[in-house]
Each structure stands twice: as structure tokens, then as C-alpha cells.
Regions:
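Active-site-proximal, Lys/Arg-enriched surface segment
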Residues: 85-175, 289-293
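Acidic, His- and aromatic-enriched active-site or binding-groove loops in soluble protein domains
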Residues: 245-256
């Protein structure tokens, strides 16, 4: 074994980069090629630039700070060109990387645990007048008023332990701040960015079904699709069923949308006809006590479905499952997991830069949102496979400290060896020292992806 191999073998057991290990596991280089990320567009390897963006997010560094403090960073123009490149397929990159991660955690699932796909949307405030894709009068549940914002519809994966981001679309309403024809980039009609831009005026339900179909076609597996009452329309649920995905949802109490067969056609009428004859079970959610019962009902479009009527003493909530074999208690417990994604959005904003994109060009916004979600998935996966799972916030801070400490420590060590090598007598006595320094430096950069200035 040569000197190089001895050094690398010794360092491999000490100098471990969890992020780089995950990227290697999911074969990120292959995914980048499949997603049309090629070096010739920006002049640098796409893998290296992606890695730098991940480090910026995990280490909580602004791009300018990262460039200033890392001797291996590229010029700022390289990063800007990268996120504005119209030929890159960011959607495919996110879906394929998510599918690869989900395949890695598949053996960790226990019998009886449901794997869920969740469709939801979030609103990210954007005050700038010229931000492409942003709209006026977007309702924010957080602020309880209409604001200027991006409306992001997303497809997420969740189980009993983790959540992952699979796909997303930006939805633009009639109060858009800029027409699509006024967007900065003039795109070729066959480019990936043009295809992505064209979907912006589609309805939320259409975007959701398209995302679901793409995920299933790319190998994402799940037991149920969870949606809130906005998406719970018979035609939407029918299309999801046709894709082989049973739906669990809360229903809007709207007799125009939901009309059933038989004598009692509305949800209120069905509830009133059954409430005295059905056995009711009780439950507790926080401080709220409730009673519920379930019934199998015939619907003109969906056929036999199971409805769960949950009464808190004040409000009547109705849930639907197109899988009629599942118990009412399990339907309620499964639907509660839809709220996992709210914590996911919170982590994305607080830890991974979602909503803090300093770009107004549509292609750059798509790229930065994708990078935030991709980094979230990497950290979530690291948390999942650790023996002592933490909250993402705790793990995020650990990774931030670990990466920076490794980089600075190795840089200092190499500088010390370099100073030693400058002493003439030492170099004479140990001809391999310069070679050792070169190998240490090269291997450290390979393992970490960057080197900090000490």
C-alpha cells in the first residue's frame, strides 16, 4: 500500500462528513446527470456547486460570507449563473433525490406504520413589486389577512418518524404582480424552465394531481394520500384513486360539492339520521374532548366510502376515507399526521432559508426553494438513521458546528505541517513530508468539499 493510501485510510476513519456520505449513498452524481445538470453551462462541476449551497444553508452562511471565508469557493457569478440556468431540471433533481432517500429508509419501516403523501400549500411573504410568480391578496393563515406573497403547493412524505419534501409548484392567481409574458428570462419553449413556468396558472387541484402522478412514476411509495378540505372534491379524490392512492381527508360541509345517494343527501342530514343509532367512541386532542362514529356511505362518483363524524360538542367535523376497511379511530389518527408538515414548513423557514430567497427571477426562485427542500431532506435523513434522533433544530446546530470545526481544524493542521516543512533540516530528514501535506490537503477538500480560512 502506498503512502497516499495509508493516509487516506487513516483519515477516512477520523474525518467523516455526514452530508457527503449521504450524497454518495443516494448517488447524487447520477441524479444530477439524469436531471440535465452539466458542467459546460457554468464552467464548474454541478455537484460541487450544489454541495456549496448545502453548506451555506447548513452552516447558516450568506453566499457572500461563504465566498469570503472559504478558499475553495467559486466567484459569485458562478453561483448566480447556476441558479438561473434554464436547462436544469430542478423538479427531477428533487423528486429523484427524495425517492432515493425514501428507498434507503424503507427497511426501517415497521409493520402497521402508514407511509403518507401529504398535499398542502404554504404562503411565503414577498414585498418586492417585481418578484416573478408573486401575487397580491394571497390569504395568510399565519397573519390572518391578505398579503403579497408566493403561494407554494407542495407534495410531502411523512411517516411516524420523519417528513421529506418531494415536489412543489408555485401557484399564481388573478392578482399576479407580473404577467408571465413580462418575466425577465426569454426561454426556449422546450427548456425545463419554460415547462415549469407554464404550469403557474393551473389550479391547485390540477397541480396536486400532477405532482402525485410524477412522484408515483418515480418510485415514491405510500399507503395513503392526505389532503385538507380545499382539495377534498369528488373529482380530485376520484383521480387520486385512479392512480392507486387511497385518500383520507377532512370534508368541507358544502352540500353543493358533496351530495350523496339515498334518502339523506347532505352530511348534516346523514349525521342527524345516524347519531342516535350508532355507537359513539370518545377521544381527546389536547384539551378538546370529542365523540365520533363512522359509517359506510354510497357516493355517486366515488362509490362506497367511509365517513367519520366527529363532534366536539361545538363543531361537527367530517372525515372521508376511500379505503373502507380502515377503522374510524385509525382514520382520525392518520389525518392528525397531516399537521407534521406544518412543523416541516416551520423548519424550512427557520433553518433552511425558505422564504429568504433574494431573487426576483422565477428560475432562481425555483432553484433556491429546491435547494432549501433538498437540504432539509438530507438533514432529515441523517436524523432518521442516527441511533438517537433529535429535533431537526438540534441536529441542524450540531451539523453546523461539526462541519465548521472540521474544516478549520484540518486547515490549521495543514498550515502547521507546511510551516514545519519550511525548516530545511526537517525536509532533508523526511522527504515524504511535502507529499503528506499535499495528500492531506487534497483529501480534506474531497471529504469536506471546502476549506475554511483559519
Amino acid at each position: 500500500m502506498g503512502l497516499d493510501n495509508y493516509i487516506q485510510t487513516a483519515m477516512r476513519s477520523i474525518l467523516r462528513n455526514p452530508i457527503l456520505e449521504v450524497l454518495t449513498e443516494i448517488k447524487i452524481t447520477k441524479i444530477l446527470k439524469q436531471s440535465n445538470f452539466v458542467k459546460r453551462e457554468v464552467g464548474y462541476p454541478p455537484f460541487q456547486i450544489i454541495l456549496h449551497f448545502v453548506y451555506m444553508l447548513v452552516m447558516n452562511k450568506r453566499q457572500s460570507t461563504f465566498i469570503k471565508n472559504s478558499e475553495n469557493a467559486f466567484g459569485k457569478d458562478a453561483y448566480y449563473r447556476f441558479i438561473k440556468e434554464s436547462r436544469y431540471n430542478w423538479r427531477k433533481f428533487l423528486i429523484l433525490s427524495s425517492a432515493a432517500i425514501l428507498q434507503r429508509i424503507k427497511p426501517l419501516h415497521k409493520n402497521g406504520e402508514h407511509r403518507l403523501l401529504i398535499i398542502d400549500d404554504t404562503v411565503e411573504p414577498k414585498r418586492g413589486k417585481f418578484i416573478e410568480g408573486s401575487c397580491k391578496y394571497v390569504w395568510s393563515n399565519k397573519e390572518h389577512k391578505s398579503i403579497n406573497a408566493l403561494n407554494i403547493v407542495s407534495l410531502n412524505y411523512a411517516d411516524s418518524h420523519s417528513t421529506f419534501q418531494v415536489d412543489f409548484s408555485i401557484k399564481m392567481n388573478d392578482s399576479k404582480r407580473k404577467e408571465i409574458s413580462e418575466f425577465t428570462s426569454k426561454l426556449h419553449h422546450r427548456s425545463n424552465s419554460y415547462q415549469r413556468k407554464s404550469e403557474i396558472i393551473k389550479s391547485k387541484n390540477t397541480l396536486a394531481i400532477e405532482m402525485l402522478e410524477r412522484a408515483l412514476n418515480n418510485g415514491v411509495e405510500a399507503d395513503y394520500l392526505l389532503v385538507d378540505s380545499w382539495y377534498a372534491k369528488p373529482n380530485f379524490i376520484e383521480k387520486a384513486n385512479e392512480l392507486g392512492m387511497p385518500v383520507i381527508s377532512r370534508l368541507p360541509n358544502n352540500k353543493l360539492i358533496w351530495n350523496f345517494k339515498g334518502k339523506h343527501k347532505t352530511m348534516n342530514a346523514i349525521y342527524e339520521s345516524l347519531k342516535n343509532s350508532r355507537h359513539k367512541s370518545g377521544g381527546q386532542h389536547g384539551k378538546i374532548s370529542y365523540k365520533y362514529f363512522d359509517a359506510i356511505i354510497e357516493h355517486a362518483v366515488l362509490g362506497k366510502i367511509k365517513l367519520v363524524f366527529l363532534h366536539t360538542g361545538k363543531d361537527l367535523l367530517v372525515f372521508i376515507s376511500t379505503d373502507i376497511t380502515i377503522a374510524g379511530k385509525e382514520i382520525i389518527a392518520t389525518y392528525k399526521k397531516r399537521w407534521n408538515i406544518e412543523q416541516g414548513y416551520k423548519d424550512l423557514r427557520n433553518l433552511f432559508g425558505l422564504g429568504k430567497e433574494e431573487n426576483r427571477i422565477y428560475e432562481a426562485l425555483i432553484a433556491k426553494i429546491t435547494l432549501s427542500m433538498f437540504t432539509y431532506n438530507i438533514v432529515s435523513y441523517i436524523n432518521r438513521i442516527k441511533h438517537e434522533p433529535q429535533t431537526l433544530g438540534e441536529l441542524f446546530r450540531d451539523l453546523e458546528c461539526e462541519l465548521e470545526t472540521l474544516a478549520i481544524s484540518m486547515q490549521l493542521f495543514i498550515q502547521i505541517l507546511t510551516k514545519i516543512s519550511e525548516i530545511q533540516n526537517v525536509v532533508k530528514d523526511n522527504k515524504d513530508l511535502l507529499n503528506i501535506i499535499a495528500v492531506l490537503s487534497a483529501y480534506t477538500k474531497k471529504q469536506l468539499g471546502f476549506m475554511c480560512e483559519s
